Amino acid sequence: MTVGISAGELRESTEEELITKLRESKEELFNLRFQMATGQLANNRRLRAVRQEIARIYTVMRERELGLAAGPDSEDSK
């Protein structure tokens, strides 16, 4: 799973990679919440970390949508 992804690393990723990481993080969050409900979760801190990773991914995607940050594809064409 995704562990400790920085915003800089995400900005270097392509759109497809971001979508894949988002899907993996959401899946991990679902599993962590399920473990929490059944009392099997050992590391509560991981819930917050995964939520923050999801927020970072959404932020990078939104920056690109608004044109505030360019993806790795547009930098090659300059």
Swiss-Prot record:
The portions of this protein that span the membrane are none
Q: Name one GO cellular component term.
A: cytosolic large ribosomal subunit
Q: Which UniProt keywords apply?
A: Ribonucleoprotein, Ribosomal protein
Q: Which GO terms describe its biological process?
A: translation
GO molecular function annotations of the record: structural constituent of ribosome
Pfam families for the chain: Ribosomal_L29 (PF00831)
Nucleotide-binding as a keyword of this entry, yes or no, is no
Matching entries from SUPFAM superfamilies are given as: Ribosomal protein L29 (L29p) (SSF46561)
Q: Domain of life, per the record?
A: Bacteria
Decide whether keyword Ribosomal protein is in the record: yes
What NCBIfam families does this protein's entry cite?
A: L29
Family named by the database record = Belongs to the universal ribosomal protein uL29 family.
What is the protein name given in its UniProt record?
Large ribosomal subunit protein uL29
Protein source organism? Mycobacteroides abscessus (strain ATCC 19977 / DSM 44196 / CCUG 20993 / CIP 104536 / JCM 13569 / NCTC 13031 / TMC 1543 / L948)
Query: Which gene carries the instructions for this protein?
Result: rpmC
